[in-house]
């Protein structure tokens, strides 16, 4: 079974994100500011700055509370990103006059409400792939044609799993209450890091030299240092040590684990991810509603026209369950982890209710242009979908 939807099309190879200008992300807003209200909607262009860091700099420059700023989606630090931020009770003229390193204010206008997470249609991507193989443009066009017709596999992919690619393993250990395993994975694998001091700190921990590991970990590794501090105090207190992790980080680990199981289910369903079956939970692309497929004759044409798509599980204690073959697949995947849906019913603000996620998403406005030995790609995806899913199918460099 291939990991690629477009397995019959040769990959282009190449390199992405060689410079910030090689990767442009631009939000497609769900609505435009009305021009009236108490929230200033500012469109920022950020160069090599993540969303949360931009919020910090913006709040400091304007003398407002960071928590009062609103945003529709999270953007990472790699590349150039254009996104809207809402700021309460600040005039557009004041925002437009700001001079913040790495941030340019492109426009500003007032609106009646604070911008909330999810208040966007999607994102447009303009990406340069450098040093591609011969015939790359034709192969990229062929891969994009398949994805335009059948959909883009809605994977999370490796960027979901942290710098060492193992945050989902921490989440799995949490759910099984295997706290030593969770701590071991959080401290990390020396083979997965390139920084010398970081590697030495991990190696010291693995030798059982916890105090030395603590001394070696740089100060900005706050989570790791707090874990190790507690282990120095009580060497066998792994649950106590792990409880020092903030709930926000614990939810991130649990979410990464959910994502890894979704990706696993998608991989097993890839050959038919654009077709619905009786027992599937289908997703309506128009409004995000989900329903159980019972009448295949009625629903199959809707999947063919991309009105609906089958879904996969973001496992949780109240998640809507599939029936039939898809339901059996999902139960097998969860049973292999020695977990049930009730396992996600955690206390302490960590309860994971779960949801359904479409196995595919539509791609819009896809264009390819050859520029010497580079490819220029331009396409749009709905919110919550990742450009890396498209790039993986085109480049096949995984």
Curated annotation (Swiss-Prot):
Name of the featured protein: tRNA pseudouridine synthase D
The species this protein was found in: Geobacter sp. (strain M21)
Biological process according to GO: tRNA pseudouridine synthesis
Active site: 76
One Pfam family named in its UniProt record: TruD
PANTHER family, A to Z: TRNA PSEUDOURIDINE SYNTHASE D
Catalytic activity field: uridine(13) in tRNA = pseudouridine(13) in tRNA
Domain annotation TRUD: ranges: 151-361
Keywords: Isomerase, tRNA processing
